[in-house]
Regions:
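Alpha-helical transmembrane segments and their immediate juxtamembrane cytosolic regions
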Residues: 1-298
Length: 298
């Protein structure tokens, strides 16, 4: 985002860039409904409106894009902090952090109703919320936005320090350690919960990403060692395609249809083989796309 939005930052006409932003948001949201929202089931009763990682990315991207376009760096930091604090207030004072007692869960149930993932229908036509589905989405959109902003900040650091790789590595690692430390302190009051994507979880996961980014930046950009890492580029250049393929198409069935004879020899490890074969098939498809320069652009 820091790279692609820089040319639109000072342009008073934000119409063209907003059209691109809305297009990306809609496409990612629809892809999310295809992957997990049961859109292809063509059954309105089992349609889930907001239930997938791609939709979380779409919402986070939309929030972060607006912040990037209309705020300078100082205000970007302030607004990102406000997103975390605004999320925290009702989560702390209007509920607890139990699966059914948290504020974010109540918002999802109230707004989405039977269009929420985890709902099951009874024979009499009534429906109920599942006690085993505890992911939250609507209120957690605030922290999704903060997560994308952390990624944008990492991009700004790398863009600004392209002529000083050592400083980039140091900055990424220091921020990563600081975010993790702060998240652990905050977790004493607000637990680190992935399914709720709490503010502490946002900082913790962001800290890990900064550390990983620093490590890879050190190895590849600073030291110039990229041998053995090309497979990451194959995945990274078509990451959304990889995710959709792996979730929508059951390649395990394809693997089982041609390797069922191995089950008698592998025993309990046969399922492990099928899982490996599933990812192998996806990788081979991505490799062909990479070599043919076919990339899914949103």
């Amino acid at each position: 985002m820091p790279f692609s939005f820089s040319k639109f930052k000072d342009n008073p006409d934000k119409g063209p860039v907003y059209r691109k932003i809305i297009k990306r948001f809609i496409l990612l949201f629809i892809f999310g409904m295809i992957v997990q929202g049961n859109l292809l089931g063509l059954d309105p009763k089992h349609l889930y409106l907001y239930s997938n990682t791609l939709q979380a990315i779409a919402t986070g991207y939309l929030i972060a894009a607006i912040i990037q376009l209309h705020c300078n760096f100082r205000w970007q930091l302030i607004v990102t902090a406000l997103l975390l604090l605004i999320y925290w207030i009702p989560m702390t004072f209007l509920g607890d952090f139990t699966p059914e007692g948290n504020f974010a869960e109540k918002v999802d149930r109230l707004v989405l109703g039977h269009f929420r993932d985890g709902v099951f229908w009874n024979e009499d036509g009534s429906w109920s919320f599942s006690a085993h589905y505890n992911y939250t989405w609507i209120w957690s959109s605030l922290t999704f936005g903060a997560t994308v902003m952390l990624g944008a900040f990492a991009g700004k650091i790398m863009k600004a320090g392209k002529d000083n790789h050592r400083k980039v590595v140091q900055t990424l690692l220091i921020i990563g350690i600081s975010l993790i430390a702060f998240s652990l302190i905050w977790s004493l009051q607000m637990p680190i919960i992935k399914r709720l994507w709490t503010s502490s979880m946002t900082l913790f996961s962001g800290g890990l990403c900064f550390l990983l980014m620093g490590a890879f930046y050190y190895r590849i950009d600073y030291k110039g060692h990229s041998r053995g890492l090309n497979w990451l580029k194959i995945y990274g250049m078509n990451s959304i395609t990889a995710y959709i393929l792996g979730e929508v198409i059951n390649f395990r069935c394809i693997a089982a249809s041609v390797s069922y004879g191995l089950e008698q020899y592998l025993g309990g490890y046969y399922q492990v083989w099928l899982s490996f074969a599933n990812y192998l098939i996806v990788f081979l498809i991505l490799r062909i796309m990479y070599r043919q320069k076919i990339f899914l652009k949103i």
